[in-house]
Amino acid sequence: MFQDNPLLAQLKQQIQETLPKKEGTIKATEKGFGFLEVDSKTSFFIPPPYMKKCVHGDKVIAIIRTEKEREVAEPEELIEQGLTRFIARVKLFKGRLNVVPDHPQLKKLQLKAKAKKGLNPETLKEGDWVVAHIVQHPLKGDNGFLAQISEKITDADDKIAPWWVTLAQNDLPNSEPEGIDDWQIKDDADLERVDMTHVPFVTIDGESTKDMDDALYAKKKENGDFELTIAIADPTAYISPDDAMDKVARERGFTIYLPGRNIPMLPRDLADNLCSLIENEVRPALCCTVTVSKDGVIGDDINFFAANIKSHARLAYDHVSDWLETGASEKWQPSEEIAAIVSDLHQFAQARSAWRSANAVVFPDRPDYRFELSEDNDVVAIHADMRRSANKLVEESMISANICAGRVLKESFNQGVFNCHSGFKAEKLTDVLELVNPEAETPFTEEQIVSLEGFATLRRWLGSLDNSYYDNRIRKFQAYSEISNEPAPHYAMGLDIYATWTSPIRKYGDMINHRMLKAHILRKTPTQTPDETIGDELALHRRHHGMAERNVGDWLYARTLANAPVEETRFQAEIFDINRAGMRVRLLENGAAAFIPGSLILNNKERIECNGDMGTVSIDKEMVYKLGDVLEVVLSEVNQENRNLVAKPTQVFADLPSGPETTNETEA
């Protein structure tokens, strides 16, 4: 008799209007209830019935009321959906289409679904991977949630899923852009290309590399100085700023590098053929010649020019490294001419490396972890590749080339695409000094560490220490690297200027710098200058690509290490992060990241403290682990659904009865 009673409805509305309301974000749990997080210190419990109106991540206004002597939140108004476009798996419930989002906090959420027009629902099977969108939401007045499937990514059991799903998740392309039938060189009529085909340039790359974008030549002078010439592939010879292909390249930003495969920024017929500096093939190139002193100082005689070049030798990193390090390579024996060039390049690189070690910042050597895949996308092996002498030779050449470009772009235009880093965050300077000065022989000052020279001095001092604890801690006080259209220093490298132009096949920013360098050569106005948004655009692309690379890696690690907990395989692991819940480590053998909860170090909250600010783990107030430490671990869990690893130390800290505060260590 009370149903649809307008007086009751009015009374209910009046009561609700008098109740307090809070705005916040929904945090779901696996147990059906949730929380309204108002700020970092305030949250309200949401009972399971109210959670049916919202999903994890929704920004809402909720009524705060007291139920069973407890304040609870009832979501009332949707401000912003937390879930719009998402990746999901098909779930058939009594033959009807449903989807389950592929998200750790949403695994229990099963949503009714429909296929969009043009997508046949009969093609969707249990477990298939799809892209879906929320099209109905209870807080918008709809009767429950409804998802629309817009795209099928791949079948449930397809081994390519880690790549295709991750790319779809980040809204990234999974194939190269479509090329054109007839590429034509579109050089400015006044651009003269110097014939450099007689110069014995060499390329040094991985054995499987196809998009070879740099060739090198060096000659040691009688006085010990080096004449270095860097030749870089020239895709802007074929692509003008107003071409459709330029728009595609800008939208992609970079070639996407994922474990086991890449997605090119440019069509493969350009990247792997017409622009690739293939041995004995004439190619258009943008070149830079500069003198580097025997002490590693880059001279003022920087000269950029356009050329036609020919690679005289296609070399591989490992073969060149073997030859440089041992005097011989089983798979490669250079001619006398090529041997002399490689030797001169190596000596140049050693001089530059020594200069950077003394005057700039050299990053510590860490292995590159590489997945070896079978033809059907199974992981055959994970290789830890150290940067060897040939890799460092190329690296020093590229860094020198990019310093040259930075100088020229700054002097000619005061504009370009520059890689920048501003050092420490201004609000963290006191923290930096409090951390390092008790350890440093000569105390640092705030005035000193805000300068490029002082920052580099501090970084070099950190690099000289016999452990990486302070280095790991201080990273949290540093600013993020940026891409700017105005010249600025790169503190993290210890360089006053840095503008990349050495990978135009793979980086859109390098294409812009090529066009500006050609304008410098021609003494003309550039056909393209970087606008104010390009830095943020490229940084966002780089962030999404980095996330995709990590996500695919996590998936492959979970597959590869699935049996490690049962087999109790022992790994050496380095601590790279500590927070109040535990610590994150990297397995040195394969590069996998794992989490060690505090409870798996010692299951006694009274005795153990994981301190994220200090970067330490203490038991009974005595430090047992710190950032940078290497310890032995075993994996206790490999979660295939969430693609994460949980580890525990083999060192056991016994849970002692109350008494003298000592730690009792045993071996697992």
UniProtKB/Swiss-Prot annotation:
Cite the RNB domain residue spans from the record: 193-521
Keyword Hydrolase present in the record's keywords: the answer is: yes
Return the GO cellular component terms, semicolon-separated: cytosol
A GO molecular-function annotation: exoribonuclease II activity
Q: Which reaction does it catalyse?
A: Exonucleolytic cleavage in the 3'- to 5'-direction to yield nucleoside 5'-phosphates
Q: What class of enzyme is it?
A: hydrolase
Q: What is its main location?
A: cytoplasm
List the SMART domains: CSP, RNB, S1
* PROSITE patterns reported in the protein's UniProt record: RIBONUCLEASE_II, S1
Subcellular location(s) of the protein: Cytoplasm
Segments forming domain S1 motif:
568-650
**This enzyme's EC code(s):** 3.1.13.1
Q: Which UniProt keywords apply?
A: Cytoplasm, Exonuclease, Hydrolase, Nuclease, RNA-binding
Tell me one GO biological process term: mRNA catabolic process
User: What is this protein's function?
Assistant: Involved in mRNA degradation. Hydrolyzes single-stranded polyribonucleotides processively in the 3' to 5' direction.
Give the similarity note.
Answer: Belongs to the RNR ribonuclease family. RNase II subfamily.
State what protein this is by name. Exoribonuclease 2
Species, as recorded: Vibrio atlanticus (strain LGP32)
